[in-house]
Amino acid sequence: ATYKVKLVTPDGPVEFDCPDDVYILDQAEEEGHELPYSCRAGSCSSCAGKVSAGTVDQSDGNFLDDDQMADGFVLTCVAYPQSDVTIETHKEEELTG
């Protein structure tokens, strides 16, 4: 399946289609959108975003704890869309406080 991903970035919103077997960060780059990242392996917080609508599968990541995921935080480098989803990007500072 393919879902609509909306990223709310500091430069304004961008939307693109993302297959459910492609990481959101990878697809965003494929579409020409630059997002922050570092490890690309789900073990840091550089690419952190916050899901404001929809659901993702980020079971490949290990940096976020259950409380952070319950709050909506997501690591875009290891997140597959499971529905149409809206994500606010550039949330590392909010996540790490």
From Swiss-Prot:
Assigned protein family: Belongs to the 2Fe2S plant-type ferredoxin family.
Function (record text): Ferredoxins are iron-sulfur proteins that transfer electrons in a wide variety of metabolic reactions.
Family matches, as Gene3D superfamilies: 3.10.20.30
Descriptive protein name: Ferredoxin
Residue ranges the record marks as coiled coil: none
Cofactor comment text: Binds 1 [2Fe-2S] cluster.
Superkingdom of source: Eukaryota
Cofactor: [2Fe-2S] cluster
Keyword field contains Plastid: yes
Keywords: 2Fe-2S, Chloroplast, Electron transport, Iron, Iron-sulfur, Metal-binding, Plastid, Transport
Amino-acid positions noted as binding [2Fe-2S] cluster in the UniProt annotation, renumbered to this chain: C39, C44, C47, C77
GO BP: electron transport chain
Entry's Gene Ontology cellular component terms: chloroplast stroma
Database matches in InterPro entries: 2Fe-2S_ferredoxin-like_sf, 2Fe-2S_ferredoxin-type, 2Fe2S_fd_BS, Beta-grasp_dom_sf, Fd_pln
